[in-house]
Swiss-Prot record:
Organism of derivation: Streptomyces griseus subsp. griseus (strain JCM 4626 / CBS 651.72 / NBRC 13350 / KCC S-0626 / ISP 5235)
Compartment(s) where it occurs, according to its Swiss-Prot or TrEMBL record: Cytoplasm
Entry protein name: Ribonuclease HII
EC number(s) recorded for this UniProt protein: 3.1.26.4
SUPFAM superfamilies (UniProt xref): Ribonuclease H-like (SSF53098)
Amino acid sequence: MPYEPPTHTVERSLRATTGARTVAGVDEVGRGAWAGPVTVCAAVTGLRRPPEGLTDSKLLTPRRRAELDPVLRSWVTAYALGDASPQEIDDLGMTAALRLAAVRALEGLPVRPDAVILDGKHDYLGVPWKVRTVIKGDQSCIAVAAASVIAKVHRDRMMAELGAASEDCADFDFGANAGYPSPVHRAALEERGPTAHHRLSWAYLDALPRWQHLKKVRFSAEAAALESGGQLGFEF
């Protein structure tokens, strides 16, 4: 399907209105998954011409994303990735977990950006950065599109490796679904129950009464850890 290639229009506007010299594009992946982290990439591209075929990662085939990923990592001025774990998502909620992952990505950059272009309509990042939210920014903004591809390839590989390396995860087909809803994923949940890599605050668990107790166990353990001054987190 034909698509309009992303441009530097938003970045140029942000530079002109804020005086920013370094602008980072930020995008996330994994928001709607049942398992695995939410991952954020921050990418600084400058105003150079992008590699051919760059667009929102969701519009690209897995093969094309894999081809573009090393090209983009070499082409961008800088990039960094940040993750928030399933436990952090359960503890904090998705909005705060997104901010945590984004801060980790931005603080991982070798240069501090003066401003940020954030994909979507909600500013989950906030101060101290100057933020411009752009709906479908991963399709229209070059830096955000680059971040979307790098984040997607990184997280997909992470989930595939998790599925291959962990016996507990073998039946969930993470290599194919990356932790997102799928018939195979649902069937494995019904049979085996969620793993330590699943988000227990997600609504899917409401349809699995056999495993409801795991939600209570995790959150009871975390509440006890907080009361004792310990660290949040629980492993099954």
